[in-house]
Amino acid sequence: MCASVTESLPKFPELKTRDLQGQQGPIRSLGWNLSGSRLASSSSSGSVLVWNSDRLDFKFTTELGNRGYGLVEQLVWDPTHSDRLMAVYAGKMIRFWDFRSAKPIAEIESNYENIYATWSPSGNYCCASSRDDMLSFIDARERRIMETFQQPCETNECCWSFSEDLFFMTTGLGTVQIMEWPSLKRVYDIKAHNSNCFCIEFSPDNRHLAIGGADAITSLWDPQELICERSITRMDYPIRTLSFSYDSRYLASGSEDRYVDIADTKTGDQIWKIPTNGPLNKVAWHPTKHILAYAVSEPNSSGLKIFGL
């Protein structure tokens, strides 16, 4: 049994990186759908492409809408449906897409310049957050804004707990604020870092909560006890993006350091390091395989790459 488990683990030195070419401009956001059959990427050129994971070639991509819809700040797939995703636009619009449709299936006009979006585990709710730290909570079934909530401090990435009764928000105070959902009653602050907290991610097995900060540290927490189990301190620049592998065994992180760090979640030790030619914008593990998509800011390229093929 132990041998079969070992054999199933990736042999990192043998894994290759592939450039996905054809999309113009640096990649701003990317993500895999529920099944891992598609990878969506948005770029500074205004294009949103959906890549076929079985045929990772530009000629097999599908463009959602057209660039007349504006610049996508963030996109996120419905966690319960492989064809649906949500995107927040620089022009204060929030759009819901179905991959099979040429036009948005719903549009919501927001009063705020939203820059981040997340979806609840049940797929029933979404949240969009703005440059002005305004949170817009959306009923994804009726596709309407339920409530807006003004944060009194800088707010960056946010997410729901697996049970969907709590909502977590990273802040510029070095804390993660926790509110009850849907009452939005503030119940606890995690004193996570000495400076701004930028990113947050639960592991798929719900045994780890990762928080990335401006102090170049990634902290790993027990989400039940809210106790810090270990810190990863290898990087020199603020942590901007985090992603757990599907089996919760590995944590990928990225910053302005010119590499992707892949850590063992049980020890925090570096398992592998992927060199890059520029700062990292986003990392995203495939939902069922040890394949990592990541976006790098590099000249004359979108910087979209796949590791693990």
Curated annotation (Swiss-Prot):
UniProt-listed Pfam families: Beta-prop_THOC3
Alphabetical list of InterPro entries matching this protein: Tex1/THOC3, WD40/YVTN_repeat-like_dom_sf, WD40_repeat_dom_sf, WD40_rpt
Keyword Amino-acid biosynthesis carried by entry: no
Keyword Transcription in record: no
Domain of life: Eukaryota
One Gene Ontology CC term in the entry: THO complex part of transcription export complex
Repeat positions for WD: 22-61, 65-107, 109-148, 192-231, 234-273, 275-309
Gene3D superfamilies from the UniProt entry: YVTN repeat-like/Quinoprotein amine dehydrogenase (2.130.10.10)
SMART domains per UniProt: WD40
Functional note: Component of the TREX complex, which operates in coupling transcription elongation to mRNA export.
Record-stated family: Belongs to the THOC3 family.
Protein name from the UniProt record: THO complex subunit Tho3
